[in-house]
């Protein structure tokens, strides 16, 4: 009804305000001097130090952290998040393809074994992962940041469920046309999976970008510092 629709709009606006206002207050406060904020508290309106504050933080090493600029830290996070998202999509695509389309013995058991890894806390895996990266001399490298968290059970689950929804007739028709397994994967499944690939990539990019605990342990070189390691 019109009344319920209007009430829904009110709730949407309230939800939007709850999400946006705190972010705006943080941004507005960042345009004031630290002395002003310490004296008067957080601010709702913009201050006079916008250009000075942000140019110092983004481009000057002394503005945020003594040996690296915020711009470099954002670049590090972007590289890490892109690497994690890309490798997660690739490994999950291939894992799901093998589990669904190859006659693998105990395929369902293997899938659930992969899926159960979601129940293993990150804290439990950190030290073994660090030891492996250390023995491979990958500590303080982008590879060391990316590889241990680039395989995703949840992404494999999404692709597996998507592949199981594709009719078996498509595979049979491809076989009749002489298409091998690799060509079927590249020419048929990947184009059909574009929407799912985009969704998983975005999900894993955000997951990688927001990493805190693993980079905190595996990075000691300042030039690899991430924003989350300085602001959390």
Task: Outline where the language-model segments fall.
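A structural signal for multi-pass alpha-helical bundles of membrane permease subunits
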Residues: 9-224
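Single conserved hydrophobic/aromatic residue that forms the stacking wall/gate
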Residues: 1-11, 223-232
């Amino acid at each position: 009804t019109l009344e319920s629709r209007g009430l829904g709009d009110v709730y949407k606006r309230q939800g939007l305000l709850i999400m946006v206002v705190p972010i705006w207050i943080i941004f507005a406060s960042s345009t004031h001097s630290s002395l002003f904020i310490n004296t008067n508290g957080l601010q709702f309106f913009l201050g006079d130090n916008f250009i000075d504050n942000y140019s110092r933080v983004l481009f000057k090493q002394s503005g945020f952290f003594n040996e690296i600029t915020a711009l470099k830290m954002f670049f590090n996070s972007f590289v890490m998040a892109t690497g994690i998202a890309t490798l997660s999509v690739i490994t999950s695509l291939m894992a799901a393809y093998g589990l669904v389309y190859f006659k693998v013995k105990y395929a369902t058991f293997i899938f659930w074994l992969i899926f159960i890894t979601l129940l293993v806390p990150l804290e439990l895996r950190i030290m073994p992962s660090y030891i492996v990266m250390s023995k491979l001399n990958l500590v303080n490298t982008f590879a060391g940041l990316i590889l241990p968290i680039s395989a995703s059970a949840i992404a494999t689950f999404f692709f597996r469920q998507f592949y199981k929804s594709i009719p078996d007739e498509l595979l049979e028709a491809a076989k009749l046309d002489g298409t091998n397994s690799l060509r079927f994967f590249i020419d048929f499944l990947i184009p059909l999976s574009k929407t799912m690939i985009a969704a998983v990539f975005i999900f894993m990019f955000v997951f990688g970008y927001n990493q805190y605990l693993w980079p905190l342990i595996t990075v000691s070189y300042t030039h690899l510092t991430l924003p989350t390691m300085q602001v959390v």
